[in-house]
From Swiss-Prot:
Keyword Cytoplasm part of the UniProt annotation: yes
Entry protein name: Transcriptional regulator MraZ
InterPro entries named among the record's database cross-references: MraZ (IPR003444), MraZ_C (IPR035644), MraZ_dom (IPR020603), MraZ_N (IPR035642), MraZ_sf (IPR038619), SpoVT-AbrB_dom (IPR007159), SpoVT-AbrB_sf (IPR037914)
Molecular function via GO: DNA-binding transcription factor activity; transcription cis-regulatory region binding
Taxonomic lineage of the native organism: Bacteria, Pseudomonadati, Pseudomonadota, Betaproteobacteria, Burkholderiales
SUPFAM superfamilies referenced in this protein's UniProt entry, alphabetically: AbrB/MazE/MraZ-like
Family listed: Belongs to the MraZ family.
Keywords carried by this UniProt record: Cytoplasm, DNA-binding, Repeat, Transcription, Transcription regulation
Subcellular location per the Swiss-Prot or TrEMBL entry: Cytoplasm, Nucleoid
Protein's organism: Leptothrix cholodnii (strain ATCC 51168 / LMG 8142 / SP-6)
The protein's assembly and partners: Forms oligomers.
Main location group: cytoplasm
Gene Ontology CC, one term: nucleoid
Start and end residues of each SpoVT-AbrB domain: 9-55, 81-124
């Protein structure tokens, strides 16, 4: 698997059919890594996770291995997963169900998160970020040097 890392934020807009254009800076990596094959699913924080298909396969295997006590989360991650493809216009189609789950209407943000991307409603992400910034630094970051 090619070495890649998604980072940065792109402000985008959904079109009337629920499609979003994949930015050029991510498109080349997605095409070379996954042949334009992506999987989208719900994220616990109210956005969508966008995985290149090979990365999704690893994530899916981890979810499938969860114990019965996590069956609700398995249902959320696997039951809402949708396979999509980047089309000839460099767009990916977001299903109506996933758009509704993440509150995606028009203005969206595509955020690089290392091995995958997150797709957020722009206003929802701004509120989520403001809430994070109001909290004290978590213990796990106390020794992190800036």
């Amino acid at each position: 698997m090619a070495d890649f890392h998604f980072q940065g934020t792109s402000a985008l807009a959904l079109d009337a059919k629920g499609r979003v254009t994949v930015p050029a800076r991510h498109r080349e990596s997605l095409v070379s890594l996954a042949g334009s094959q992506l999987t989208l699913t719900k994220h616990p924080e109210g956005c969508l996770m966008v995985f290149p298909r090979p990365v999704w396969e690893g994530f899916r295997a981890k979810v499938e291995a969860l114990p019965m006590a996590a069956s609700g989360w398995k249902r959320i991650f696997l039951g809402s997963a949708m396979d999509v493809e980047i089309d000839s216009g460099s767009r990916m189609l977001i299903s109506p169900e996933l758009r509704a789950a993440a509150g995606l209407v028009h203005d969206v943000l595509l955020i690089g998160m290392g091995n995958h991307l997150e797709l957020w409603d722009a206003q929802r992400q701004a509120s989520a970020e403001a809430a994070v910034l109001q909290q004290p630094m978590p213990d796990v970051l106390q020794d992190f040097s800036f």
